């Protein structure tokens, strides 16, 4: 304390944006820089309730899918600040599509190719063309916009940007067809380096969400 963001549920926003700051000022304690009210997590368009029997126990979900998967799903699929519907089926679709098929597939294909054709090493002789540089500069070129969205608690923008980068990295590897470049070692090395560097950057960006 003092907190950059005081995060509370929208149903108690008045108490934490009016009374709580007054208490802090009376006690001469610094105020948070921002108060942000998050929405509710719904089940079937309804607020979860024991009487309705529509509660999803997070501990049960974590036991099956893991904490990282649940955290990823909630951040991606529930727009921060708004109410959001969740279900076990949607969670499975999300983690299978994004983490297994998209991220996992990219990591498996590129590292397996590097192991076979680059002696499991990151190539050090690189000659970049425009397509390579577009991929390598994707995060640095958009860093200011990403920071702005995060500062505004638009967290799902951040994760959707990462998903977009994953699609582009997979497309880049497919389009460049390094398996057809074995007679052009320089080009093969550049493609492998660029793809591995995209995996490194994407993994770094995912770390706050799925450490």
Per-region residue spans from a language model:
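Helix-rich, typically C-terminal accessory recognition domains appended to large enzymatic cores
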Residues: 90-127, 138-210
């Amino acid at each position: 304390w003092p907190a950059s963001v005081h995060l509370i549920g929208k149903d108690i926003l008045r108490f934490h944006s009016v009374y709580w700051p007054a208490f802090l000022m009376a006690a001469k304690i610094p105020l948070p820089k921002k108060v942000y009210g998050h929405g509710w997590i719904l089940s079937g368009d309804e607020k979860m309730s024991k009487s309705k029997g529509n509660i999803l126990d997070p501990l049960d979900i974590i036991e099956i899918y893991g904490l990282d998967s649940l955290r990823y799903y909630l951040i991606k699929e529930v727009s921060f600040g708004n109410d959001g519907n969740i279900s076990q089926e949607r969670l499975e679709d999300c983690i299978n599509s994004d983490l297994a098929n998209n991220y996992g597939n990219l990591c498996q294909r590129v590292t397996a190719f590097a192991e076979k054709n680059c002696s499991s090493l990151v190539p050090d002789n690189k000659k970049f063309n425009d397509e390579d540089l577009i991929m390598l500069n994707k995060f640095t070129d958009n860093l200011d916009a990403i920071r702005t969205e995060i500062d505004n608690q638009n967290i799902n923008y951040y994760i959707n940007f990462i998903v977009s980068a994953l699609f582009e990295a997979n497309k880049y590897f497919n389009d460049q067809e390094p398996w057809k470049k074995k007679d052009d070692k320089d080009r093969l090395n550049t493609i492998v380096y660029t793809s591995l560097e995209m995996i490194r950057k994407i993994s770094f960006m995912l770390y706050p969400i799925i450490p």
